[in-house]
């Protein structure tokens, strides 16, 4: 599910010291003999005062940094966890983030916030979260942060996972915030691992859209879930299936279950038509199948590399045509009118 701030909600070392290291301008002027200050020192002091007045000082000073959005980084992800989250869950999340970043590149800045089942602990984590937001962007209003529409107590109550992409024309800080929880799926469920991969593939998708304009980002990523969620789901399950110790038939089993959603399509409806909401699961499931179908007709590189490389400059439809040789409309028609009518056995042949 996508919220207006670019927040994805997928249905289906814990730093304690959050104080920033601050670099102040304040030089120390020692007392001079006779109480007199040389003219040169007075001039330096005057210039420093002007700098403070012009640019701010201390915690409220935001140092302009080069915009490296979309470039891989050596900066590690940050991990924060509620007090009721076991260290084993933090380590599990780190492990699967590493699998994803090794496969698709390390993009950031990225934070993971891991919520347990205690609403009290989640409220404490919310306060910590808002302190971090204020630290990274002094313009953050704590009241609004603490009372945002979907906070950590919702995750403690309902579970699930999500990505909040912070990239707009208002905020000074751009980055990615992934939230994991203690249920739906929980850390003891196998699905927890591909869900970490799923959320990180959303990071990969958004890292390839440089624009700060909300409408541009929505257009390039597609408003309805068929494309972004289908892509994240298939690529996550595909990568998970290739890991050591995962049973050989895993991917076919998962994808066969997803085909059940084809029976829920309405007459004349395509996955592109289905918005986020109560029927979004159809777009998640069959969107994953559409990406598998697309890759079977081209290649993994055409989807994962070529398309996203061209997306920002060419736009969605031209990047699609360049990468796959046909329009999205034509391939969606083939997918619905031909592929989904094949036998189950024939459909599963495209799954590696």
Question: Where do the model's predicted regions map?
Answer:
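Positively charged n-region of N-terminal signal peptides that target proteins for export
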Residues: 42-45
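Zn2+-dependent metallopeptidase catalytic core
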Residues: 81-159, 193, 197-200, 207
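Acidic/histidine-rich, surface-exposed loop or edge segments in extracytoplasmic proteins
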Residues: 69-87
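Short hydrophobic targeting helices and cationic amphipathic motifs
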Residues: 4, 8-9, 15-18
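Zinc-dependent metallopeptidase catalytic helix centered on the HExxH motif
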Residues: 158-253
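Bacterial N-terminal signal peptides
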Residues: 47-57
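Acidic/His/Gly-enriched intrinsically disordered linker/tail segments
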Residues: 212-286, 297, 305-352
